[in-house]
Amino acid sequence: MGTLFANLNSSANALAAFQRSLEVAQNNVSNASTAGYAKQVPTLNALPFNLQSGLLGGVQSGAPQSTRDEFLEQGVRYQTGLLGNFQAQAQSLAGLEPIFDVTGQTGILASLNSLFQSFSNWSASPDSVAARQDVLAKAQDLGASFQQTMSVLSSASDSIDNKIGSTVSEINSLASQVLDYNVRQAGGGPADAGLDAHLHDTLESLSSDAGITARFESDGSVTLLLGGQTPLVIGQRQYSLSAENFDTGTPVNANARPTAHIVDASGQDVTANVTSGTLAGLLAVRNSVLPGLQGDSQQPGAINLIAKKVADRVNQLLASGLTPGGLAGVALFNYDGTSAVMAARTLTVNPSITTDTLAALDPGPPQVANGIAMALAGLGQSKAGTDTINGQSIQDFLNGQTQILGQQSATATANQSVAQQAVTQAQALRAQVSGVSLDEEAIRVMELQRGYQSMSKMISVINGLADTLMQMV
């Protein structure tokens, strides 16, 4: 009778083990689409078998085993960081490309071409009032184009500053979730597949925002580092980041927009540690591309160089000429010359100039009635040293800036496409190891159900034998 009840107990243990295994499989199916979830594998542990000691063997359910591979997780995070970087660059640069219309139909290039054409028309009819009025009108259009372009660039900088700030806030928020995980780990308790899934989903989101390194410690906690160096979370302490704008060197240009920086909890500049993720892409455009166009404390920017060169050379040529009344010419353009970054945003037509004070005559010798107007008409393509910017004609320099921006945008877009493919491949490789296959789980459930049914039948048989024996007593 004792052996019968021992077999009943062994069968009950096996039944419970199969039940627990079925629950694990069901949990896998339920979380097949849960972000960060790794497939759990049920375990069955053999019980000791020794008839002399009354140990009849059997099985019991063990703790489910996770199939997560941290090496593969690290690979996904790395590729996700690269994608975030190139994606942020591509999106930001795509917003800047319309500023420089390569067709020459709009923007600075169109206005500049129109001004030079008005000079050409004026040179053909130097005494024409209509031609002179057209010169003044086209000069006003050019000033407005420069101001509009600088306004768009300034708005782009503001937008990126806001995105940098929101990204830093998101990083701090996600880091606080890692901190919460560490606090729970310190409290002990069994492994939690849901908590583990949330942690790895958080780490992947952090990688998309910035290049982070996650180190799993022996006590179960996670150490989080920015760029492998700057601590974000260590144990049960969080170190928050902040975004600030300031210049690190002595400013050469007054009234320039300061550089964007990332500062750690101790106030140290850790911008150099931001090497991937959305934050890196935003910083690249904010601190490199935009200053190259609108200038900063150390450089005037391409747009200001063009505005200053056009204004200075036009004014110099007009000042060297004579009006129809024999008076010296006056400047066509005004701009704020107190800082190299102010030329384009302040470029306007001299309010004192009129059609009568436009000087087309070159006093020579020899005197040429339309000499100044002709020189102005050819200014855009002139290779003379005083007419060039960095060795290029004004129009060639502007076209070059347009091409540079277009190439930067195309490169970022191409890199984004490659990075997206790499992320997809890394995720697919991870899914092969730790992803949930519904077909595989269906087969496992069928196998476990058969085992469960067998144990149920065994228990039913033992119960029947026990009842029979009890009736015989």
Feature names for model-found ranges:
Residues 1-473:
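Structural signature of extracellular appendage/secretion-system components
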